[in-house]
């Protein structure tokens, strides 16, 4: 039976390194999900209240244009990652792209997804230095603590 692998994915170089590592190391019969947590901007971008001030409306439009561009960049990065996996021998139908709006926080949302039947979680390491990482933490550290019963691979 093939493993279900969850790769926490954004458009960062670290996430791409995690994909490249999976492409090199894991058996090609795995089922891979590239999972992205995205800001829930629908409530802001779909807001068309007549009470909006002209200033807020102009700022809303600018914000929504930027958010749409970010989503396009993420989609392009997901397709690039899928291409890397396919080029390494995974079949197209073994790879799923999944994006969910942020509900409880990036790490909590990744952990919640991991608890839906995955055998392995793969994360890229952000690479904060020293004291900053100690105080701020990181998504990978939080996922480690929230999904302790799952195997987790953190790629630097």
Task: Tell me what each language-model feature is.
Residues 33-35, 96-100, 153:
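General small-molecule cofactor/ligand-binding pocket signal
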Residues 30, 93, 150-151:
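A structural micro-motif
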Residues 111-156:
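Gly/Ser-rich helix-loop-strand patches that form or flank binding pockets
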Residues 5, 22, 85, 110, ...:
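Hydrophobic structural packing positions in well-ordered secondary structure
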Residues 73, 79, 83-120:
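Structural beta-alpha unit
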Residues 37-41, 65-79, 83-84:
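Redox- and metal-dependent alpha/beta enzyme cores, enriched for Fe-S-associated oxidoreductases
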Residues 2-64, 88:
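Small/aliphatic-rich secondary-structure junction motif
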Residues 15-18, 106-107, 136:
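Amphipathic coiled-coil/heptad-repeat helices and related helical stalk/stem segments
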């Amino acid at each position: 039976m093939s493993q279900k692998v969850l790769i926490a994915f954004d458009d960062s170089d670290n996430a791409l390194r995690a994909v490249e590592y999976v492409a090199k190391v894991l058996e090609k019969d795995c089922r891979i999900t590239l999972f992205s947590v995205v800001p829930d901007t629908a409530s802001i971008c779909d807001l068309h209240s007549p009470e909006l001030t002209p200033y807020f409306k102009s700022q809303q439009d600018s914000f929504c244009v930027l958010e749409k561009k970010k989503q396009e960049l993420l989609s392009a990065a997901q397709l690039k990652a899928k291409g890397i996996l396919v080029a390494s021998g995974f079949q197209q139908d073994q790879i799923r792209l999944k994006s969910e709006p942020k509900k409880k926080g990036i790490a909590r949302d990744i952990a919640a997804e991991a608890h839906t039947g995955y055998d392995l979680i793969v994360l890229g390491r952000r690479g904060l230095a020293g004291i900053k990482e100690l105080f701020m933490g990181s998504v990978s550290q939080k996922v480690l603590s929230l999904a302790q019963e799952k195997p987790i691979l953190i790629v630097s």
